[in-house]
Each structure stands twice: as C-alpha cells, then as structure tokens.
C-alpha cells in the first residue's frame, strides 16, 4: 500500500465565538462538524446529524471533495479522533477526547503532551507497515484562528484563511490579542518554545498531527491550508527536517488575497501543491460559490485531490464527481 489518507478530527471552543467560524450553520453546530464530515466520507449522509455540514449560507462541506476523490481513486481512509466533543459513528483511532479551550481565558491545550505521546505511538505502528506516505487531512472548526495564534507566537507575520469570503481578520486578531495578553506574551516570543505555543494557543488536531509525524518517519503530505502551516511551523521549531513534508491544499486557499498562504509557506520552508479544482460551471450555487471564496478547503480536500491525480484522474474528473455527489444530496432532501 503506497498511500494512506488520515482524517484527524479536532474541536476547539474558539469555533463557538460568534463570527469566527462558518464551518457549521450556527456556532453551536460547529461542535458536530468534524464527526459529520467523517461520517459523510463513509455514508450517503452523516449519522450524528441528518444533514451534511454547511456554512450559515448553505455551502457544502469540503468533505464532498474528499469523498469524490476517494470514490474515484479508492484510496484507504482512516479517521483519527484527535480531540472532539463526540466520537464519530465510523471506525476510528481514538487519540483523545480533549477539546481545545477558549484561549482568551485559559491555556488551550494542557493535554498536549499526552496527545502527542499517543499519536506518536500510532505513527510508529504505521511506520512498521509498507505504507510509503501519509496524507493527513483535518476537520477542525475555528482552526484557522488557533493556527494564526500559533504562527504569531512563533514569530510569523501570517494571516490565515477563512471559510468565508469575508475573512473575519479583525475579529481573529482581537481574539488573539486577548489571548496573548492573558498569557503575558508578545508576537514571536515563543519561537524557541513551540510546545508552549501549542499548549497556550493550539488545538488537539495540531498536537495529533505532530505526534503522528514524529512517529511515522517517511513522506507526509499535510493536507490542509493555513492550519497545516501552523503544524509545519511547529514541526520545524521542534527540529524536524521539512524536506519529507509537503502541504497539499486548494487553489482557493493559495489564491486567497486576505491570507498569506504562499508567503508563509515560503518563510517556513515547505513546498506546497494547490489542487486546481473548478466549480465555476456547476449547476449548483452552493458549489459555484467556492469560486467566490466560500469554504475553500478542509477535510483534506487538496490532499485527496492530489491522491486522485496521482492515481491518473484529473482535477476535472474530481470536480465532475463532486457535482454528481451534490446532485445525490439534493435528491435526498
């Protein structure tokens, strides 16, 4: 087996700050998005809730892209519970049920050490298999805000993306400023103490991916946008050689003018791939709006597309399959 796709699920209380995350129809529903995303990959629709996760405007979860790529290329998917409110109702590896706290009030992840340790054990077991490459995606509502906080703590002048075309950058910065004040630190102050940056401002997805990457010593594709930049920056600060890593995301993240994906990836020193999906001709507004900056990435959409392309399919094939899956969803309503 050449490649294994891991989907790491995480929750953080930050997703319930009004206006921060649109990875769910309401702030409260963002708590269920990770498990619903995982369930949708294996079933016609999620089991925990009866609908697929959508933004408040009704745009479908990027899990639809991952599912489309998987239906084409048939790569194996393993779900990893990094730290969520609920367990997904699909087979999964349990790392923790610790949820990231609201970092304005307290350190985000006191359990980071246990999570890294367990995830590293899991990575070490995967290292004993013939798998040559892990492609690691994530579903973590609120995760672009924790990512930006971690990147700032490590000294990167980064702006992270958002699943909304109106990136709530000023709200993110206000929330992060409050967190830095609580922790008594300034930008860049934790560049030599990455684990403290993770403890203070991170989320369980980051800790899980770091642990897996420390245990599995072959090639790793970090399948995500700006959230995986935070993971890369933490790995680099921990002394990892980034030459065995790459980030796979979508063109919607790479082209996001409100964020600094390309610049920050360069600054960290990690190569990236941006899946050239195109929904502009879709018959569904929910998909066409991806081209207007809605949703952009998540659930390893870019990495799943990359696996499909490696298996001989084109980004157009993936886009067509997404259209078909979305039609199936509409017919089920």
Swiss-Prot record:
GO molecular function annotations of the record: nicotinate-nucleotide-dimethylbenzimidazole phosphoribosyltransferase activity
InterPro entries for the chain: Nict_dMeBzImd_PRibTrfase, Nict_dMeBzImd_PRibTrfase_arc, Nict_dMeBzImd_PRibTrfase_sf
Disulfide bond entries: none
PANTHER family: PTHR38811, UPF0284 PROTEIN SLL1500 (PTHR38811:SF1)
Family note: Belongs to the UPF0284 family.
NCBIfam families linked to this entry: nicotinate mononucleotide-dependent phosphoribosyltransferase CobT, PRK04447.1-1, PRK04447.1-5
Name of the protein in question: UPF0284 protein TGAM_0534
Organism (species): Thermococcus gammatolerans (strain DSM 15229 / JCM 11827 / EJ3)
